Amino acid sequence: MAPLSLPESLSLIAAPMVNQSDLPFRLLTRKHGATLAYTQMLSPERLVYDREYLQFHLRDLEGSSSACCSDLGRPVVVQLCGNDPDEIVRGARLVEGLCDGIGSLYI
């Protein structure tokens, strides 16, 4: 993944909210001035082992790059939260091509 090139002004970053920061919410925050949006905290273990969970979040991220959303859907940073560094890396690899950055929280 290439380094993220951010706008000079990051005064309005849409912080993540659990179960709220999906594509429609991120689009609204971008429409109202946010220069960067985050996904909600995603479980890397569920991305790796739960096909339905993975497909839902892949569709959400693919929507960020679609023709209808490309000007508002990006940049987007995916957040991963887990307690197994190997699982965090596996989860990151599943989404890395659909986002502009990945943040992780090791708990």
What are these regions (language model features)?
Residues 39, 103-107:
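Non-cysteine beta-strand/loop elements that form the S-adenosyl-L-methionine
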Residues 2-8, 17-98:
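Glycine-rich, positively charged N-terminal anion/phosphate-binding segment
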